[in-house]
Amino acid sequence: MVRKVNIIKGNEGQGKRIKFVQLIFVDINGMPKGMEVPITRLEEAIEEGIAFDGSSVPGFQGIEDSDLVFKADPSTYVEVPWDNVARVYGYIYKDGKPYEADPRGVLRRTLERLEKLGIKVYIGPEPEFYLFKKNGSWELEIPDVGGYFDILTLDKAKDIKREIAEYMPYFGLTPEVLHHEVGKAQHEIDFRHDEALKTADNIVSFKYIVKAVAEMHGLYATFMPKPIYGMPGNGMHLHISLWKDGENIFKGEEGLSETALYFIGGLLKHAKALAAVTNPTVNSYKRLVPGYEAPVYISWGYKNRSALIRVPAFWGNGARIEYRCPDPSANSYLAFAAILMAGLDGIKHKIEPFAYVEENVYEMDEKRREEIGIDMLPENLGEALDELERDKVVKEALGGAYRNFVGYKRKEWEEYLDYLEAKNLPKDTKNVTEWELERYFFI
């Protein structure tokens, strides 16, 4: 079976002796969890599954009923180039059936629903991250003072980015663009779009690679949405297109198709509820403030980076939409499922997109925004969860994970409010607290 898996992934003959394989899934937060087993158990992991206790996995089962089974997906098998270990993603089962709260399973079921309509989904993410020096405290130290697109001496992390890019193909990712971002020590490596499930896997793999390479160089990498007050946050813009019979159905004769516009309409309608899933942490809303190119206003436009939804200047089979509010703290499987069902609702009910803008939304006064019908995203996680609980479409998109997700996030929000009260801090503070750093720095 190991040889068969190697042939599937094109890894046969690398001369490495793989002794262990990591069985990887994600918890309700999108954090990778799993276990290592001897490589001799890989066939068992694929055919029968490996049992584990789900009671200590955030957002999974209670201690009274916690027996779960991991079944490996052999198409995801890769060998870690810097270690004699392999990795494989998979699905969670309970009592012989797919576990309803398994985030990867939630996305698979969403995609199966779209496949019945003949639709395939392609998504290209743009996850941003910071690199920090290790100093044993939360006084974050930056290793470079580069700025946006700086490529010469100011960007001291260029060798690290190149090393990350060199490792990415081993995990099935194709790097396309490496560049310094706006913030000091902030970076972005874009990789090629792929089918939605593969892209969700790729995001988990990308974070793993970035953190591992940073560690090799004595640095920390963080995908935390807003690690430092006053500096740009980490976003994860998503480029989305739908395909049918080998054709991009977002492609119109002049710009976007009617289908694409209805998809945008669905996203705009459900944007407030979606925020709970695409921006699922307390810290996410420290990023979503005016002045840092992070979208705050629910609007759309062509080439307009101040809008929530931007239509890039690519036509034909390159036609797509860019959803700009997500950040890397999102569980990519749940976020993709929610976004796709919101967009599908727009297509199904022919929801016309509203709040079209050509000007900079941040420079508009309140009266002008009201004239156009521009609303705002939630201002904090608590508000976002309120919106989610009122939105039937997004709730149903999360399937069996919904109750666990909301319960976990409500508790998270309440713990944050308790911290603010104990520290005598205002509820609406935009400062990044030590509570957030301790909770989110390693996401």
Swiss-Prot record:
Mg(2+) 1 binds at E126, H237, E322. Residues 16-97 form the GS beta-grasp domain. Its main location: cytoplasm. GO terms for biological process: glutamine biosynthetic process. Coiled coil: none annotated. InterPro entries: Gln_synt_N, Gln_synt_N_sf, Gln_synth/guanido_kin_cat_dom, Gln_synth_cat_dom, Gln_synth_gly_rich_site, Gln_synth_I, Gln_synth_N_conserv_site. Its EC number is 6.3.1.2. Its cofactor is Mg(2+). It catalyses: L-glutamate + NH4(+) + ATP = L-glutamine + ADP + phosphate + H(+). Mg(2+) 2 binds at E128, E181, E188. PANTHER family: GAMMA-GLUTAMYLPUTRESCINE SYNTHETASE (PTHR43785), TYPE-1 GLUTAMINE SYNTHETASE 2 (PTHR43785:SF12). Probably involved in nitrogen metabolism via ammonium assimilation. Catalyzes the ATP-dependent biosynthesis of glutamine from glutamate and ammonia. Oligomer of 12 subunits arranged in the form of two hexagons. Belongs to the glutamine synthetase family. This is Glutamine synthetase. The gene is glnA.
